[in-house]
């Protein structure tokens, strides 16, 4: 009675698409949204701010490291020498050099940066992507919230919200030559006519049971399946998950390359599919890239990743801008924390949440500015420190979501989306 994978996996995609009904029931106090979609680039492990967006050339050698600063399109603003392409689009970005929190553990830092809350043993809070799915729901046949290539952290999930608000993870890396997304194609032996026939049979059986028992859960379940069918039946939605139609020029713009001998996948393929997903209607796409936890041999680790990230990120910004999408697409680049200002005895940098850098672009964010500052050693905030509550509240504001609104947590206890967060006007266009 079920279509291939849908029967084998229970609700599967239908469960994911439960968010449509939840969004319909939501009584959100909607603000005017500047951003229609978000592309969130998560640099997993702890990204070194002083070797990327906040170099300190006048610091002692054990602090400044080995990368020279290079000029950007913003007068007097410098990035590290591995950020050559991003330096050319600095006039389209806001670089925050004063991000700060207190969590030195990876998982605790992730929870803080993804939810706007410090971790609590009593409650796991929902990620921004899951709140967006809950509050705004899907567009057309696309899932609201997608993770590329996988859910890079448990705290990118739905927290205390329903699992239906969790991300749809691709389950495969678009940089691989054999890339395909599970669950998006009809199984072998089931053509379009057979697919529609099975759908009709299920609707007939559901109608029979609905006449015998009026149950809200049954009615809700029915809508989940309908959404799953809609995605399977939409060629446009399925096409968004493929890179086959992209030109060689676009691939070159993103710096796409085959899977190489070094175990570092191409950022370009991941960022390009993120653009395709928001273009097709996805509201929130999180792309996880890299392994930045460089406690030893720091510069060896970043030299295999940072140029790839640089090319792909600059390509994404250019592509969105040229397509007229940047003003309505909020792009975020963040990590769970930064890295220690001083290089350790093993040639590495350790965890450092006290100050680090993030990037925001498009979607109502001011173009061409540096917000905040770190001190001379990139060790502490020196100006306009930005905490997680205000950062996440500002992201919600740009999406038209009131972060002061309460959602219902377990035990029917109202819980603000963010507690005591303020919109940072200095970040807004």
Question: Which functions belong to the PLM regions below?
Answer:
Residues 1-429:
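Ligand-binding pockets and gating/stacking loops
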């Amino acid at each position: 009675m079920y279509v291939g994978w849908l029967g084998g996996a229970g609700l599967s995609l239908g469960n994911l698409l439960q968010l449509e009904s939840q969004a319909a029931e939501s009584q959100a106090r909607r603000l005017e949204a500047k951003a229609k979609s978000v592309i969130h680039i998560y640099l997993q492990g702890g990204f070194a701010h002083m070797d990327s967006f906040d170099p300190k050339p006048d610091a002692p050698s054990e602090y400044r490291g080995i990368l020279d600063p290079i000029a950007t399109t913003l007068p007097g603003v410098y990035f590290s020498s591995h950020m050559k392409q991003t330096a050319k689009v600095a006039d389209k970005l806001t670089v925050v050099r004063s991000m700060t929190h207190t969590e030195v553990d990876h998982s605790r830092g992730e929870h803080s940066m993804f939810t706007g809350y410090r971790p609590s043993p009593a409650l796991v809070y929902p990620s921004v992507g899951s709140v967006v799915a809950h509050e705004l729901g899907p567009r057309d046949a696309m899932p609201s919230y997608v993770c590329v290539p996988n859910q890079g952290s448990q705290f990118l999930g739905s927290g205390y919200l329903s699992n239906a608000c969790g991300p749809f993870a691709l389950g495969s890396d678009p940089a691989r030559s054999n890339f395909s997304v599970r669950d998006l194609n009809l199984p072998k032996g089931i053509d379009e006519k057979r697919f529609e026939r099975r759908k009709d049979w299920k609707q007939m059986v559901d109608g029979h049971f609905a006449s015998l028992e009026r149950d809200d859960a049954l009615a809700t379940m029915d809508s989940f399946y309908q959404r799953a069918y809609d995605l399977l039946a939409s060629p446009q939605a399925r096409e968004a998950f493929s890179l086959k139609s992209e030109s060689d020029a676009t691939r070159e713009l993103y710096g796409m390359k085959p899977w190489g001998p070094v175990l570092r996948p191409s950022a370009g393929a991941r960022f390009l599919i993120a653009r395709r997903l928001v273009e097709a209607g996805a509201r929130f796409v999180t792309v996880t890239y890299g392994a930045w936890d460089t406690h030893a041999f720091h510069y060896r680790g970043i030299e295999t990743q940072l140029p790839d990230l640089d090319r792909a990120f600059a390509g994404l910004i250019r592509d969105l801008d040229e397509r007229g999408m940047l003003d309505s697409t909020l792009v975020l680049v963040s990590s769970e924390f930064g890295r220690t200002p001083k290089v350790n005895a093993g040639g590495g940098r350790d965890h450092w949440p006290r100050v680090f850098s993030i990037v925001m672009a498009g979607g109502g964010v001011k173009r061409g500015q540096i917000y905040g500052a770190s001190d001379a050693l990139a060790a502490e905030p020196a100006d306009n420190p930005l905490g997680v509550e205000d950062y996440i509240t500002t992201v919600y504001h740009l999406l038209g979501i009131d972060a002061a609104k309460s959602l219902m947590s377990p035990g029917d206890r109202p819980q603000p989306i963010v507690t005591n967060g303020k919109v940072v006007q200095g970040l807004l266009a």
